[in-house]
Amino acid sequence: MKKTIMASSLAVALGVTGYAAGTGHQAHAAEVNVDQAHLVDLAHNHQDQLNAAPIKDGAYDIHFVKDGFQYNFTSNGTTWSWSYEAANGQTAGFSNVAGADYTTSYNQGSNVQSVSYNAQSSNSNVEAVSAPTYHNYSTSTTSSSVRLSNGNTAGATGSSAAQIMAQRTGVPASTWAAIIARESNGQVNAYNPSGASGLFQTMPGWGPTNTVDQQINAAVKAYKAQGLGAWGF
């Protein structure tokens, strides 16, 4: 997803301190007081706010890793961009904001939607930038639906399981949906010769996987013992 819009003096109030535009200073999350949880929530659930305005005035360059995802927020004081991607490099969301016109394009399950917007600008030579298709999977802002570059999805059952996992672990449902899509393509009865099985492809030591509830319980046990590292994050 790639968007362009004229930079505004409005900013999402995040309690982030930084440097004025033009200083060229690049601040990482460790250098400033960044509300990481709020930035994560904006990236997953309030992308319209991130596209409407930078997270603060002036130039900034903020990067951090949380719950298996790398988050990036940058601005040169005039244009701004944000993105988040899985630790293994699969891009989950991306926005590059600059100029006056923008075109939004993203995948939501199997449906492709587009939104266009035109704003007044003092720059008469700004061109709209359309969304590229290089990202490996995209998430909608209203569900945990995920589609990988190879076509894998979490499916309806997997998306429901991802929501339950989010409630039981505190890890975003979109993360669990991505894991399910990658590990089993949303197939409840998926089995690997290594012994891994179910939506989450857990090993027998974490418990039986005959039902979806058992698969969720096994995944919770694996997460509590090893975190997202149990799935390579």
Curated annotation (Swiss-Prot):
Presence of the UniProt keyword ATP-binding in the record: no
Principal location listed in the UniProt entry: secreted
Listed EC numbers: 3.2.-.-
Compartment annotation: Secreted
Keyword annotations: Glycosidase, Hydrolase, Secreted, Signal
GO MF annotations in UniProt: hydrolase activity, acting on glycosyl bonds
Annotated GO CC locations: extracellular region
Pfam family, one: SLT
Annotated transmembrane regions: none
Signal peptide start-end: 1-29
Family: Belongs to the transglycosylase family. IsaA subfamily.
Function: Is able to cleave peptidoglycan.
Protein name: Probable transglycosylase IsaA
Origin organism lineage: Bacteria, Bacillati, Bacillota, Bacilli, Bacillales
Protein's gene: isaA
